[in-house]
Amino acid sequence: MVEFYINGQQVEVQLEDEQTVGDVLKSFESTCEENDAAVIGIAVDSKQITAELFDEEAAKPLGSNTKFEFSIVTKNDIKASFEKLSALFNELAAQMEGVPVALQSGKNAEVSESIKRLADSIEQFCHVATLASLFPDTFSTGSLNGISFKDFFAEFSPILKDFEDALQNNDTVMLGDLSEYEICPRLKEISKALQSM
């Protein structure tokens, strides 16, 4: 019996006239498109199907015990992720506003943790933005005040590096200025932009 798993969950699928692995993959892709979803990973009989292997694997005949495992993402998943990131960036903006006071109170570890969360959040944003590119009709307006997200983060990265350097050098004046006047406003911009996606 042919088995199907979507995001780790077994599902019942009715095959029609599919004869090859490729027929099944094409049919599944069409179904995903009809349901505002995109395939981001495929395994057939526990073998990951990469772009290099796709044509070779697709030509194989469909066996009676073939196991298909699909990883998919939906537009709604991406919207929900952007909403969570918006709230997270807003929360981080508030934390960054409090950096000068935290430093004066000797809470350097708290400040370091905020920066780590910020870096993790930016990495998470980049991952979600990459997935969003699978739906260009829905998520094509990725910009902040007319600047692409890519350019925005290219400008933001040196500021974060300066903040990290100031933290290592215990330069509380620089840390306060960067967090209050550079980082916090940018986090608010990101949060606002993500709310409208």
Q: Where are the model-predicted features located?
A:
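Short amphipathic, charge-patterned alpha-helical segments
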Residues: 17-33
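Intrinsic, low-complexity N-terminal interaction/targeting segments
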Residues: 133-154
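Alpha-helical oligomerization segments
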Residues: 154-197
